[in-house]
Amino acid sequence: EPSEAMIETMYEAIPYDSYDRVIAVGGGAIMDLCKLLGCKRPTSVHELYFKREPVVHEKEVIAIPTTCGTGSEVTNISVAIVKDEKDGKLTGGDTKLGLVSDDIIPNKVCLVPDLLKTLPYKPFAASAIDALIHATESFLSPHRKTVTSEMFSVKAMEMILEGFRRIALEGPDARMDYLGEFVHASLFAGIAFLKAGCATVHGMSFPLGGTYHVPHGESNYALFGKILEMYDEYEPAGELGKFKEIVARCLGCTKEDALRTLNVTLEKVLHLK
């Protein structure tokens, strides 16, 4: 995860007047760092993340993702672990915060599926599950969901679930013929949660990343199944009912068995410790 100290070091190493544009090639952390390089330099990273300094886009950012999970190439958020504070005073601990502003959305995106060929399987699987969670949470959003976000979230879920179905049946190498779909699905999920936001899974996973430095995709995955079960106990119909219909259609099961089948499939894709 990017950290406050890492960002400060980056600012010191790369003078602001030494470049005209930023080309971000990497995973979500690289995207988040490079999105900041496209903005006016703050006097303090800490003040920036605690929203006491404005975010001002000034330089072109071209995003080229090498993972298929964060969707950071199309989102308006940059996440970092920063020094925590309470009532304006440092606590001595760290916290994970998202800097949200449309000024940090990259100007252009270039998707190159072949870049995923050398991505090790575990980070591939964790990032793809993260993309599925982005799509799911934006689809289930009760207040912010729009026609546009639903279109992108449904397509992302369908593409990712089909890829996971293949991996569950044929093994990890099955992903190699489906990398284009995975990288596009990640972008679609990013657009969906740019519009509709994320929810409980991401809200609860942030402390795991900030305090224990658990990788983002893995911390989300650890919470995903149980939170869906809680949703199902609280309100099994409505948007969750529609979500279960999508899962059932994609994974070839009944609507009643959708959440269990999803958990079984995800366990085959990536063992949850």
Spans of features found by a protein language model:
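Acidic, glycine-rich active-site loops and adjacent beta-strand->loop/helix elements
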Residues: 1-2, 29, 37-40, 66-69, ...
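Short glycine-rich or small-residue beta-strand-to-loop segments that form or flank ligand, phosphate
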Residues: 21-25, 62, 189-190
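C-terminal and late-domain segments of enzyme folds
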Residues: 121-188
